[in-house]
Amino acid sequence: EHAQAKRFTLEAYPLVALLEGARVTMQPGASDLHYDVSLTYADGRKIEERVYAPNQLGHAQDGTPELSPTGWLRVRDAEGVPQIDAAQATEFQQVFRSIVDTVRGHAWGAHEPYFDRLEIRVDLPGIDFALPVDEEIVSTFEALHEDVYFSLLEHFQQHSGRPSGDRGLQPGQIIPDIRRHDGAARVLISLEPFAALAPVAPAALETPLAQMREPLSAAQIAGCMAAFGGDTFQAVSRQGRPVLGTYLRGPGPAVFISGAQHANETSGVVGALRAAQALAARGDAHFALIAAENPDGYALFNRLREHHPRHMLHASRYSALGDDIAYRERAPFFEREGRHQAHAISGAQLHINLHGYPAHEWTRPLSGYLPRHFELWTIPKGFFLVLRHHPGWGERARRLIEGVTARLARNVPGLVEFNARQLELFHAHALETGFDVLNGIPVQVTESDREALPLALISEFPDETVYGDRFVFAHTVQMETVLAATDLHRNAGV
């Protein structure tokens, strides 16, 4: 009763894919924390099993009940009579609780931000392996990173008097650095100042953007941005890194193209640069471009992926202030000032904002399993588009989303099939569609005045964190999204 709806069908992901060739049916069961498993074989045999799912009821900081997986110790005597049958805190759970309790017990003061960097170094044994299903991995190291990061965000949201999930919170930069270690677990929590920065010199690419098989470095991004020329503009991040922008003047309406608002979503950076190169090569380009909006988060992402290259690394998602730059509420605006300049210099009415999301299952097993406020993002569901429009722009938004999805389905080989595979598995475990599907691409269109420009097209590719052919495919889809939206906006008046 304290588990979220569909919690256990989602927890079973990706069982349906692992049992390829078998028909799998999942139905709600009793509330006694057992899976009832019925196996029917081709030869007519039937086997019934009950599998215990050890869970323990706890509460989030705001009092929300959380039914979370736990260790369990069951001891029977020589006659088979249970002597111990109870939850047993594992080392993994004890590490998590020690971190959260230490942070909760500290006197943080009354004003944001509360620190520059909150470094949480953890060394412990664990599990980390790939599954034979798409980009899926199973990792206790990743799970701990995610649960520590978001649990501490929730603590500081409550400490500051903000609602749970508030993205404007500026606690400072929270950095869970989780490492594999075969001995006893170790935890070191420290408050650190921001480090002095070395200048980043623009670097030329040794591989064409179209063939990039991993995220770009900051130097490579700077080199690509410098090559455009145009009217350059710049903001400065909280840690002092440049937020590089350029404006290419041309005929017709302008668009604003951006990537890496969330810095662990890296396919959009390459996609934005590739699209800008293609538009510039036509000779009539008219756009403002910020390929990497969040350079502090991007630097942290590159630091953390040295140890866990395939993890989603959500601690690098937000800025060094700890907020989502798109939700920044007041000056100094730092990175967001780049958007303000892009809007002013270009007069754009369409923002093409390239994003990503986890390429494999996202869990918080120490806090109720499903990621709070992000439950619909817990498993991949293909490439999809979110379109937000101001009041009065609904018809133009409809034409834009119809045109972009049709062109993507036509111009990107394998995209519709890729989406169909991921959506089929999503439906099997989420027991819902999640989004409308248009031309084989999930879409969500909403009226909102939160976006600065009248039209905001947000792309979402499951790219956290992929490499090789999948990364090339990801940034190709991102590029084609920009090209399709730009052409439709310029030529069809949407």
Predicted regions and their residues:
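Short glycine/proline-enriched loop/turn "hinge" motifs that connect secondary-structure elements
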Residues: T246-G250, R317, E447-L453
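Short hydrophobic beta-strand that contains or immediately precedes a catalytic carboxylate
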Residues: F256-A260
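Active-site/substrate-binding loop(s) of hydrolase catalytic cores
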Residues: G252-P253, S267-V270, A281-E395
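Amphipathic alpha-helical scaffolding segments
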Residues: A272-A276, Q478
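Alpha-helical scaffolding within the catalytic cores
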Residues: G240-R241, R303-H308, I441-T446
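Short acidic, Gly/Ser-rich segments with clustered Asp/Glu that frequently serve as metal-coordination loops
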Residues: Q261-T266
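Soluble metallo-hydrolase cores and metallopeptidase-like ectodomains found primarily
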Residues: P199-P253
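C-terminal accessory segments enriched in acidic
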Residues: E1-M212, F334, A344-S346, P365-V494
